[in-house]
Amino acid sequence: MSILVVDVGTSGLRAAVVRQDGSVHFLNYESCRPDTPSSGLVEFDPQKMADAVLRVCNATITQSKNSDTIDAVGITNQRASTVMWSKSTGKPLGPALGWQDLRTVFDCITAASEHSIKLAPNQTATKAAWMIQNYVVAKNLDFSDVRIGTVDSWIASVLSNNKLHVTDSTNAGATGLCTLDASSWSERICDLLKVDVSMLPKIVKSTGVIGNATALPGSPPIASLIGDQQSSLIGQGCINSGATKITFGTGGMLDVFTGTTSPTKMQRSENGSYPLVAYSDEQTTFWAAEAIMLSAGTNIEWLRDDLQIISTSQESHEIAMQVNDSGGVVFVPALFGLGTPHWDYGARGTLLGLTRGTTRAHIVRAVLEGIAHRGADMLEAVIADTKLSVTSLRVDGGMSQNLMFMQSLANTTGLNIEISPVTEATTLGTAFLAGIAVGTWPSINQATSTTKPAKVVTPTEKLDRAQWHEAVTRSRGWIPSLSSLDF
């Protein structure tokens, strides 16, 4: 019994087979990077994404046909990116807006000042409103023929030959358009933004059969939709209160499972984390809290592509290990500002403590340690907001393979670091939820029991957090106009 997983990320997408023992096979990947037509704008071509999804799915199915029977399909995706397409033809009505797109910043400010609605530009709400005005109203299109959805909705439509128009509660909760429990659309918010509720998808549970992938051989049932970070949370077995993971990709996302008690508001908490739906089944909605690092792996790319002091991302480990410490150098990884707990969009990357004796090894090590310090910042913020006890930290993403970085994370947090056996744990999470729906596993506990840490890194020393906090203070407010923004 096997599950086909479709994982659509920000820079690429993949398909793979997950077997009953939790092992991942026949992975096929295609790069699918967004376009940036000008500063602050992030778009992608939905049709190119759809074509790529079908290619990787068909490749994986072909490779697995002699060894695996596909029992179900699970879909996991970048959250909040917004697609608009025709109900009658299933074709896109214009470029999709990526979650990083900032063209609606002033719409968010207006929503807060005039209507007391707190929205962020990385949510779907104002993107959908912008698309309606620019793709529908401006072209005098028929409102009844318009569908709007996040990437999970779009891929479900593609795989079902335009039969399904659905999203799950984890994705709905990231739109800014739904009710507090993420079970239905808020008519008040939709009315204020002039988003017609009839254009939006039906909100379904994260696990459960919702239709068939008739665009694929055998038409397997689609049995799970879930946002990528929540999928990673489940994929690393974080299904008990206080269980915590960090995914280090382009940015860094820390999520802690908080249980079944719903939050009193779906807004940023006092220490900069956000409540969100972890996943939902027929009986229960489970909750989590999330902290965000705006820049993680991008700092390594900066060392490699711009400063050119490392040749490959993997070399950052080798170079950093040439010295015992950073030689007093501190790097604040704020290339795009600071997320949790500060939320200072005007902060900028800061390199302090340079001397004539500073080498590239010191700088590379300082960059890795700076990202680790940001991980500790996020952890402290989430603990303060949730009042939960966190006893270990599970980690996935490309940077989880850098053992020097993993050691720095252990030393800054004081926790054991449990490294995921699968770099992209998102693949496992949605597989588990789809498998539960069709009987591959009898329960979430049984499913997650199949995955164990590939390695556990324990703290060996305590890195200086006082000097770190001083460095962060110096990095903040560099661009005052951006620092004043509050979403």
Model feature map: region roles:
Residues 101:
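Carbohydrate-associated surface elements
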Residues 4-5, 105-123, 129-165, 179-187, ...:
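Active-site core segments that coordinate phosphate-bearing ligands/cofactors
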Residues 32-43, 111, 166-173, 355-362:
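Gly-rich Lys/Arg/Thr-decorated short loops/hinges at beta-loop-alpha junctions or inter-strand turns
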Residues 12, 79, 200, 274, ...:
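Short glycine-rich loop/turn motifs
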Residues 62-98, 120-122, 156-179, 204, ...:
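Short beta-strand-loop/turn "lid" adjacent to the catalytic site in phosphate-handling enzymes
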Residues 1-93, 110, 142, 218-224, ...:
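N-terminal glycine/serine-rich phosphate-binding loop of ATP-dependent small-molecule kinases
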Residues 187-208:
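A conserved helix-loop-beta module that forms one wall/lid of the active-site cleft
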